[in-house]
Amino acid sequence: MKAFAVLFVLSLIKTELRPSYGLPLLQSGLYNTNQIFQKTQTLPPFIQDSNSTLPAPSTTNLPETNKLASHLQHRLSRSLLSANTTTPKTGGELRGLPTDDPWVVAGFVTLGVVAGGLVLILCYLYTPCCAYLVILCCWFKKWGPY
């Protein structure tokens, strides 16, 4: 039970940090694209890239019905029209921290070390290691970043 409490707290922390890194708040499988994105009759203009041809994001394609739709539109526009288009993006790149302030970076590192230490202590004291690893793997599979 304590392991689930720790995983619940980690889920809350992760939910609070997701908007800072530009990640969606819900899993991608929960989005119904027919409700968020409107279908259009016209084809968007294309951006010619050295590796591929990508459709340019159009601001008229997305409804402004709620904050989630406008947030997704903003993130989509920023990801497709990035300044560095010469480097191919494979989807596995690490995202930078949202700020360059060294105190914020030190705070994130400290938070990670403390959370990791608490998980290790709970793993050692309260549950057998094998069972805890199974619980942790299931948690990452369901609520993990991918």
Swiss-Prot record:
Record lineage: Viruses, Varidnaviria, Bamfordvirae, Preplasmiviricota, Tectiliviricetes
InterPro entries: Adeno_E3 (IPR009266)
One Pfam family of this chain: Adeno_E3
Function: E3 proteins seem to be dispensable for virus growth in tissue culture cells. They are potentially important for virus growth under special conditions; E3 region may help adenoviruses to evade the immune surveillance of the host.
Annotated protein name in UniProt: Early E3 16 kDa glycoprotein
Glycoprotein as UniProt keyword: yes
Keywords: Early protein, Glycoprotein
Glycosylation site positions: N51, N84
